[in-house]
Amino acid sequence: MAPKAEKKPAEKKPVEEKSKAEKAPAEKKPKAGKKLPKEAGAGGDKKKKMKKKSVETYKIYIFKVLKQVHPDIGISSKAMGIMNSFINDIFEKLASESSKLARYNKKPTITSREIQTAVRLVLPGELAKHAVSEGTKAVTKFTSS
């Protein structure tokens, strides 16, 4: 019985499609044509302003630091993109490392101590020392003001 049941719907569908196509192509197509433009027109009346997706970058800060260090040197947009990607990568590494440190110590909060330890672990040698001193200076300036 299963093969018969499978054959019957297959036979009926083409017959129904043919009968629908033969009986009312002139009637149904204009109605559908009329409905679609009205719906599209109604959607067109409610024009919503497309907001430009804001992308946060470090480009302005990179440029400011560049001008502090070398005022006469510029940077290409491709190099700026690379620097922005580099900073995002470093911050992501620092965040994950400080998160691990907080978890190891069973603390719910990432403090400046976890960040400082993460900097020492992620950055190599002399760079870590300079980063820690600059970070300490920035935190002191922030808390004093």
From Swiss-Prot:
Can be acetylated to form H2BK6ac, H2BK11ac, H2BK22ac, H2BK27ac H2BK33ac and H2BK34ac. Mono-, di- or trimethylated at the N-terminus to form H2BA1me1/2/3. H2BA1me2 and H2BA1me3 may be methylated and/or acetylated to form H2BA1me2K3me1, H2BA1me2K3me1K6ac, H2BA1me2K6ac H2BA1me3K6ac, H2BA1me3K6acK11ac and H2BA1me2K3me1K6acK11ac. The modification N6-methyllysine is found at residue 4. Residues 1-53 are annotated as: Disordered. SMART domains: H2B (SM00427). Its main location: nucleus. It holds the Pfam family Histone. Belongs to the histone H2B family. This is Histone H2B.7. It comes from Arabidopsis thaliana. The lineage of its organism: Eukaryota, Viridiplantae, Streptophyta, Embryophyta, Tracheophyta.
